[in-house]
Amino acid sequence: VTIVAARPRRRVAAWLPRLGAVVAAVLLWWVLTDLVAAPQSLLREFGPQHVPGAIAGLLDRGVLLPDIAVSMWRLLVGLLIAVTVGVPLGLLLGLHAATESAVAPVVQFLRMISPLSWAPIAVALFGIGHQPVIFLVAAASVWPIVLNTTAGVRSIDPGLLLVARSFGATRREQVSAVILPAIRGPVQTGFRVGLGIAWVVLVPAEMLGVRSGLGYQILNARDQLAYDQVMAVIVVIGLIGFALDLLARVVLDRP
């Protein structure tokens, strides 16, 4: 009974520092926007005390939930494209050292370019709408998946492949029975990193002339001088990003 009762106390004790950090951050936010800011400063409109009412207003207008849904759809499609391209490419580079050596300069060059730098090209190719946003999300998240998949393949014990070959396993069977299970961890890590980068890139990508999504809603609120709504959307973006990372950890860390 004592051991069982001690577990909830340990969990509470583990969460107390995190809760304290959140409270301290919100308090600092309030001090900067309410006490430090000048009486007529627009900075006061960004205070935490305005956020709940602004979120309620966005919900009453029926714009917040549809914008969240659109942003999530663009994120998921972009990530699906990144995984579809990144995992096979990572397998190819990991299995063929000569290919990896040949394309390494190109890969390093491309991955060092900010995904948002491709925005003018994306708009020129796809026009205004979902497509350029999805393209930028995919371009942002594909490289962590490629690099982690390649590293995962390179780290496989050669003895495992040798055993598979000794049993007469074909190349396809080696990939499905040995390589893919062995690189699960690195691929999951690449996906989590790619997810975080994709979410960061998504919001500015939605400011490229589209008329939906959380990025668009920030611009729309700014144009209406509704700075409390700007801050509210920023808070929503942060909360969703935190929830996505937590969900990815829970789902991907399952044995």
Question: Could you describe each region identified by the protein language model?
Answer:
Residues 7, 35-81:
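Periplasmic/extracellular loop-to-transmembrane helix junction in inner-membrane transport proteins
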Residues 108-144, 151-152:
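Generic hydrophobic transmembrane alpha-helix motif, especially the helices
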Residues 145-193, 218:
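Short cytoplasmic-facing helical segments at TM-TM junctions of multi-pass membrane proteins
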